[in-house]
């Protein structure tokens, strides 16, 4: 095991625009997929696919994709019912159903991918890697939503939103009590270790996006269904436990936790080290629940180490490489 201490990063002066996207057919439904092209990226660049967390979207990957696109052909999807993706026709939001959507998208590309998932997207990505190993070149999980012996209070309370009759009422009360500006600010405060690192130039756009989401008939159902799915996943025991899925993963794996994550306890890193066959486990100091947004340079550096890319993903990430508390495990 090696341990080193990270220094603070400096947020950029102006955020880049979100990447353009398109609707992609995956069987009986469609998903919205953003791509980050780079004219310098080789035509044979290996594909990467990013999967967002609960109530997130492909917009959560903008800055990390900007760093990875120099070496990888980066895509990020909106899971069904989130972002710009319509819901699945069957209305299912289970981890298995969401994993089916991701699998269909990867199969459409006809090449195995470097799969990267955050929170709910981490649970979905783990399911994909465990059940369809031939589709995965590497797996990166950022604060994955997996059963925890020390669950954070916010994560314990949140599945209540998934309860029939109770969930819709709570959502309506929340929307009525707090205007979109305050709700966006609350999400940032919860998910970031240092909310001051959030690019304020993006704040108005996120408020507008939340207003749009509030007007969609299926948005509340997507939130409730996904919350219910996470709650059910946490209760799975024995051979059906997500941690058993972790033991089945054969792809090179990177698991990143945030030292100041308010939703996923970083002490889960110990269990991750025990359950994955071959993994690099990283705890990023001064980092919250969305490391790919708050510390994209550090995340890109760690992915560069995982993939063995010479020089990492540019000068900045090369300087950051190895700055986190890390341990490598091989069973």
Question: Residue locations for each model-derived region?
Answer:
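Catalytic histidine-centered segment of alpha/beta-hydrolase-like enzymes
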Residues: 263, 284-300
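Conserved acidic catalytic loop of the alpha/beta-hydrolase fold
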Residues: 96-113
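Conserved HGGG/HGGXW glycine-rich cap/lid loop of the alpha/beta-hydrolase fold
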Residues: 29-86, 293
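Conserved alpha/beta-hydrolase catalytic His-Asp/Glu region
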Residues: 175-245
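Alpha/beta-hydrolase fold catalytic core
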Residues: 1-48, 69-73, 106-111, 304, ...
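Acidic catalytic loop of the alpha/beta-hydrolase fold
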Residues: 234-237, 260-264
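Short beta-strand/loop motif that positions the catalytic acidic residue
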Residues: 249, 255-257
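Flexible "cap/lid" loop of the alpha/beta hydrolase fold
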Residues: 130, 139-178
